């Protein structure tokens, strides 16, 4: 068969395989188009679970007559025009594929009118070449899209549709998610002529909890803890259910949004789960409705056909920001304010200084130029004081080249109130969970830390060595071996070959796999920490070490390897130090409680402070 260009209808049907999975996919794409058009009211009519009819009507800006035909063409869109726009997407749609794909697998009619036009126009595509016909029609300002007989021309796809009830439940769930994303839009959903959902728009400063309760239920609303956590252009808002009262029914409520776009993102879910892990059982899941706002330049939404996933350029910082925001709310809930004097006074509940964990406490205070203090309040019941107006009708966007991420490493420590003198704890008490907050890098390989007002210096190469030893030491299961693309073949002596054969089982537990013959050994796999090392130097040194040993313990071999690994960083940065200490705290908690020699050294500032005061 010769190479040929596919007919437009066939090409659109192939694209529809990714965009149009079921009727709910059609509803999602069309409602998002309405939101991009600035609609404040959207009416959705469904018949037979969407298989017979999907009708979306909005009061948005409409489409001009001259652009109706283009609206049904592939890769035609008004939302982006250049590569710069693609790298900072602020609209929900941007590819220009949805209408063309939907019209290729259904009978689609598009009717629209702009405020400048005296009459509306209707367009539909038909035939093998998808030729568009435009004719006048009666319609108010806005757009109506009718999708009839979905998959009528692709029987195999139609056969895979579920029951009418199941398909409508999927549509209902999509509308729930969209209604939680846009409190400022009225959304009405009807099925087979009966109104099923009515979500009225919440006015500016109105009660979002009313819609939250209608969608997520009163049980979630009663346990919801409100979050507002901000640093520069990073903002986290929403609600998380109290983990102490989470039920299996509540755990099904997991909604997250990035710049107003509904997401199922593993990084966000992991950060929330990690913040709640101390209070959740092994088989429990947190319940949350969270909104993350981030500079569009720092997130890529063009990584999934249905746009369900995103990729953050600074994923570690986003993860720690979300983790700290959720953790602070949960910690604040457990706190009881202490009276400052004998008279009872109302104590405002403010967020304490973030848990001093490496890489997780740079969000304690907002950036200096934007002094917006994070706050925590339990979600009020309907009728209480108004909440802040979010999410906004139009997503706010400023073209900034990632300054927030540099500011994250320069955030000043929060000011502490003066308290009565208390007995000083050692720099690392037995109940400490963290080395402290990284202030700066000293002499290229030492981190200056602060915890509870105490200053200390930490050797980053030593911490890295302990981390590598923990990563190499086998636990209940052997260390995972990483096959080498090009196996390393080395010549060995009879003594070295004998030592390797005796140590083979111990090396296998460390993830080192090899084969030997008469005078050579071939290294086929090594553990992950060794992949970036110069194995032509390290492996011969390891063989020489083994030849001098009589007992081969995996722990001793792991210790030797860790001490002989070359550091990955000749000059450490703040971000690298933060990442390293976060990993050390997770994998080597014993080092926090009892740091070994050469790792941590306290710095006594009292002589310097005294000298300053005596001047």
Curated annotation (Swiss-Prot):
Keywords: ATP-binding, DNA damage, DNA repair, Nucleotide-binding. InterPro entries: DNA_mismatch_repair_CS, DNA_mismatch_repair_MutL, DNA_mismatch_S5_2-like, HATPase_C_sf, MutL/Mlh/PMS, MutL/Mlh/Pms-like, MutL_C, MutL_C_dimsub. Residues 364-391 have a biased composition (Low complexity). Residues 363-397 are annotated as: Disordered. One of its GO terms (molecular function) is ATP-dependent DNA damage sensor activity. It comes from the Bacteria. One of its GO terms (cellular component) is mismatch repair complex. GO terms for biological process: mismatch repair; mismatch repair involved in maintenance of fidelity involved in DNA-dependent DNA replication; regulation of DNA recombination. Coiled coil: none annotated. Belongs to the DNA mismatch repair MutL/HexB family. NCBIfam families: mutl, PRK00095.1-1. This protein is involved in the repair of mismatches in DNA. It is required for dam-dependent methyl-directed DNA mismatch repair. May act as a 'molecular matchmaker', a protein that promotes the formation of a stable complex between two or more DNA-binding proteins in an ATP-dependent manner without itself being part of the final effector complex. The ATPase activity of MutL is stimulated by DNA. This is DNA mismatch repair protein MutL. It comes from Escherichia coli (strain K12).
């Amino acid at each position: 068969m010769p190479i040929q260009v596919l007919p437009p209808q066939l090409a659109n049907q192939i694209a529809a395989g990714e965009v149009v999975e079921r009727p709910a996919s059609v509803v999602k794409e069309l409602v998002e188009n309405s939101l991009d058009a600035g609609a404040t009211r959207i009416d959705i009519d469904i018949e037979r679970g969407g298989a017979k009819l999907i009708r979306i009507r909005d009061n948005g800006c409409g489409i001009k007559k001259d652009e109706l035909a283009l609206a049904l063409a592939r890769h035609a869109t008004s939302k982006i025009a250049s590569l710069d726009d693609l790298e900072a997407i602020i609209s929900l749609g941007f590819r220009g594929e949805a209408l063309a794909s939907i019209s290729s697998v259904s009978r689609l009619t598009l009717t629209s009118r702009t405020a400048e036009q005296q009459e509306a126009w209707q367009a539909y595509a038909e035939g093998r070449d998808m030729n568009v016909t435009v004719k006048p029609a009666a319609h108010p300002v806005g757009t109506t899209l009718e999708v009839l007989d979905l998959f009528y021309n692709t029987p195999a796809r139609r056969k895979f549709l579920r029951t009418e009830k199941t398909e409508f439940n999927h549509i209902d769930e999509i509308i729930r998610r969209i209604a939680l994303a846009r409190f400022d839009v009225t959304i009405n959903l009807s099925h087979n002529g009966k109104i099923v959902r009515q979500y009225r728009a919440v006015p500016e400063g109105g009660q979002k909890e009313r819609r939250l309760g209608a969608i997520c239920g009163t049980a979630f609303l009663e346990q919801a803890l409100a979050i507002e956590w901000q640093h520069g252009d990073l903002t986290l808002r929403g609600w998380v259910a109290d983990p102490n009262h989470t039920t299996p029914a509540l755990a099904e409520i997991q909604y997250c949004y990035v710049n107003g776009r509904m997401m199922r993102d593993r990084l966000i879910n992991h950060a929330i789960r990690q913040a709640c892990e101390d209070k959740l059982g092994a088989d429990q899941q947190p319940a949350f409705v969270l909104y993350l706002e981030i500079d569009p330049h720092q997130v890529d939404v063009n990584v999934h056909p249905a746009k369900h996933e995103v990729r953050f350029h600074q994923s570690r910082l986003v993860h720690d920001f979300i983790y700290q925001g959720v953790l602070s709310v949960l910690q604040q809930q457990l706190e009881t304010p202490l009276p400052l004097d004998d008279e009872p006074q109302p104590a405002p509940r403010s967020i304490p200084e973030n848990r001093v964990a490496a890489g997780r406490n740079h969000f304690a205070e907002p950036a200096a130029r934007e002094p917006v203090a994070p706050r925590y309040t339990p979600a009020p019941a309907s009728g209480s004081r108004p909440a802040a107006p979010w999410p906004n009708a139009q997503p706010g966007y400023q073209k900034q080249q990632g300054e927030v991420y540099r500011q994250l490493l320069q955030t000043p420590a929060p000011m502490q109130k003066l308290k009565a003198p208390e007995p000083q704890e050692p720099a690392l008490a037995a109940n400490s969970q963290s080395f402290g907050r990284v202030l700066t890098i000293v002499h290229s390989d030492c981190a200056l830390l602060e915890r509870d007002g105490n200053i200390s210096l930490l050797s980053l190469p030593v911490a890295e060595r302990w981390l590598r030893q923990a990563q190499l030491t086998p636990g209940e299961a052997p260390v995972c071996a990483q096959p080498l693309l090009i196996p390393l073949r080395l010549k060995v002596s009879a003594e070295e070959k004998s030592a390797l054969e005796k140590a083979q089982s111990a090396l296998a537990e460390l993830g080192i796999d090899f084969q030997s013959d008469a005078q050579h050994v071939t290294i086929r796999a090594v553990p992950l920490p060794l992949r970036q090392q110069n194995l032509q130097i390290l492996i011969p040194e390891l063989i020489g070490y083994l030849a001098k040993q009589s007992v081969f313990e995996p722990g001793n071999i792991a210790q030797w390897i860790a001490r002989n690994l070359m550091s990955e960083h000749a000059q450490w940065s703040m971000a690298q130090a933060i990442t390293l200490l976060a990993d050390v705290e997770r994998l080597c908690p014993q080092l926090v409680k009892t740091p070994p020699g050469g790792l941590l050294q306290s710095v006594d500032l009292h002589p310097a402070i005294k000298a300053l005061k005596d001047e």
